[in-house]
Amino acid sequence: AWLARDPRYTQIDWDELIRQNRMAGGHAVYALEDRVERLCNLAFDASFATEADARLTLRYGVSLRRENTRSYKQMRDLLGAGYVTDIDRFLIDDDTYGNLLQNDLRHPGRTVREGDRFGYDYALTLRGAALRLQADYRSDRFRADLSVVLGSDAVSRRGYYEKELFPGGQSYGPSRVMRFTPYTLKAAAGWAFSPRRYIEIAAAAAARTPRAGDLFFQPLYNNRTVDNPVPERIYAAELNCRLTGPVVDFQAAFFAAMTLDGIETRTYYDDMASVYCDMAVTGVGRMSCGAEAAADIRLSYRWLLSLAASAGRYEYIRDPRVTVLSDVDNSAVDVQAVSRMGGCETGGAPQLTALAEIAWFGPKGWGCRASAGYAGRRYVEPMPLRRTDRIAGQGGITREFFDAFTRQERLPDAFTLDAALFKSFRFERSRLTASLMLRNLTGEADTVYGGYESLRVRRIRPGDDTLYAPHASRCTYAWPRSFYLTISYRF
């Protein structure tokens, strides 16, 4: 039906929704809501510099910040109805919790009209302070930088609604304050063999405060925090070299990075437990290493050839721990379960890439370019939940089903072909440029852009038995042949 462009499936029948609302006696059956995030970020920064001598400069300073995000639902359009009652509609038919429907016990049965807040209302706040010191050394051929940043952060939640499922301080008012000590250590050194040849090496170690939303199992209406949160640790090193010449400019980089103690949270429906759940994944570890190179070759005065390529390995290097709580009462579904993530590839980033582009810069501001790209060794983003004993162990009762839960799907290699035509108009102190860009010239409609594993599990009942298998991966696709016209003015 979707491929046939049946409007009953490709479009929303607004007239039918309004008709249903008008038959409900004023109470909305359907409505449009906005999920609002209001940001209020304040920062103070003081920086100073002292020249110790002609080659050494010391830079130091202090910074303060306060980041506050207020999140709530707001009624946009009641679609012809008069009001809606502020209750949790997911619990209306629940045999156990069907009598705990109020989204805000302090205003039970509240009537919501267009423009009113409802559902949830909370704020996440981060307060931080940091001291920094940097030393810059410069000579004719040698340069070196050393920097240290030491900070202190505090993260908390404040609920403005008292959820009936989680009365009192479980949802209303301030949560406990989680404190972290982030830091960053960086060192870099470079040597210029000549004005056209340069090499640099850099290394860094850091601890980063987790994202505020990842520190709570369900920040919409629950003050429950992740157990024993710690900063995410990062270690990285990079080697860069650059060569420039009258015909060819070349640069290459070799890199390695490792992150440890990552935290991720999400809400989902657990098919094995038959309940909505909140999940926290802790101890996530990743490793990235590889090399990349790029070259610009001036074929003639008007022709430029650009080449680039990269090869790397991006993978999970540790088995994280998974804790799952019921979304309705915080009861434990699975606690500190080991997920077999070690050795899985990181999704989203191709491990092999190549690009070639040729450009022509003609007279009177005319120009065109064409490019071809390749992305290979791509994988869907793996889900830690599927690789726990509760899912893969209990659900994968045969080797075939166990492999289906734990095997990571590889995406097909992707190729792109693009082109652009542009014209520039120069004025006395400004420039106007018009560009026509054509993306995906071949018109491929089935090029996979990215994907991730589903958290859902399907039941298979051959006779009296019940088997479990994972749902198929969710994939997004690149745009088909597309045309873009841009006009820019610089002055």
Language-model region placement:
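Repeated loop/turn-to-beta-strand initiation elements of outer-membrane beta-barrel proteins
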Residues: 55-58, 141-146, 196-199, 247-250, ...
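Outer-membrane beta-barrel domain signature, strongest for Gram-negative TonB-dependent receptors
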Residues: 1-68, 73, 249-251
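Transmembrane beta-strands of outer-membrane beta-barrel pores
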Residues: 64-70, 139-141, 150-156, 203-209, ...
